[in-house]
Swiss-Prot record:
Alphabetical UniProt keywords: Ribonucleoprotein, Ribosomal protein, RNA-binding, rRNA-binding
Oligomeric and partner information: Part of the 30S ribosomal subunit. Contacts protein S5. The interaction surface between S4 and S5 is involved in control of translational fidelity.
Recorded name of the encoding gene: rpsD
SMART domains for this protein: Ribosomal_S4, S4
Organism name: Corynebacterium kroppenstedtii (strain DSM 44385 / JCM 11950 / CIP 105744 / CCUG 35717)
SUPFAM superfamilies: Alpha-L RNA-binding motif
S4 RNA-binding domain segment(s): 91-151
Top-level division of the source organism's lineage: Bacteria
Keyword Cytoplasm: no
GO BP, one annotated term: ribosomal small subunit biogenesis
Keyword set includes RNA-binding: yes
Protein name, UniProt field: Small ribosomal subunit protein uS4
GO cellular component: small ribosomal subunit
InterPro entries on file: Ribosomal_uS4, Ribosomal_uS4_bac-type, Ribosomal_uS4_CS, Ribosomal_uS4_N, S4_RNA-bd, S4_RNA-bd_sf
A GO term, aspect molecular function: rRNA binding
Length: 201
């Protein structure tokens, strides 16, 4: 599946949000490319909604067609569509690996999952979009644990801040999904109601 692989900082500046996490270049220049020193142009309601959708897509590394499927599923489920959408995005396996501190970025987490380094409930899963469920157990495969990266990740877990809905066992690199996240537990600068308004037109 094709994905945006261009300069992450440029995309972050255009959408005014750090899509990478800890991007020093974005912190220095948080305004859109080509707008240095210019007053912000008043944006239309449609443009704001579109930007919010793009922000969510690029934050989680999802193409438009797949994102539409997420929205359709969120709309089908009971409850608030926006909340459901954010829970679906946050429950992707690659995002869980990132949230647990086993990858520096979601892009790296996606690569680690795609290369088959993880199991879910004892079964190998190499699909980044795999939806985790409550009580799932995610492990690094035995042969993968010998990789230098996982040695470094294991050391870094001592300082990792893990969301309350997850638990990480540093000694085994095991991730426990105690529950699916609630919207209040998802710390991303996305106004999902604007996305709902975008697709409701």
């Amino acid at each position: 599946m094709a994905r945006y692989t261009g300069p992450a900082t440029r995309k972050s500046r255009r959408l005014r949000v750090d899509l990478v996490g800890g991007d020093a270049n974005f912190e220095r220049r948080p305004y859109p490319p080509g707008q240095a020193g210019r007053a912000r142009i008043k944006e239309s309601e449609y443009l704001l909604q579109l930007q919010e959708k793009q922000k969510a897509r690029f934050t989680y590394g999802i193409m438009e067609k797949q994102f539409r499927r997420y929205y359709a599923e969120a709309h089908r489920r009971p409850g608030k569509t926006g909340d459901n959408l954010m829970v679906l995005l946050e429950s992707r396996l690659d995002n869980v690996v990132y949230r647990a501190g086993l990858a520096r970025t979601r892009r790296q987490a996606r690569q680690l999952v795609s290369h088959g380094h993880f199991t879910v409930n004892g079964k190998k899963v190499n699909v980044p979009s795999f939806q985790v469920s409550q009580y799932d157990i995610i492990d690094v495969r035995e042969k993968s644990r010998k990789m230098v990266w996982f040695d470094e990740a294991q050391e870094a877990l001592a300082d990792a801040v893990v969301p309350a809905w997850l638990q990480v066992v540093p000694s085994t690199l095991r991730i426990l999904v105690h529950q699916l996240p609630e919207r209040a537990q998802i710390e991303v600068p996305i106004q999902e109601q604007l996305i709902v308004e975008f697709y409701s037109k």
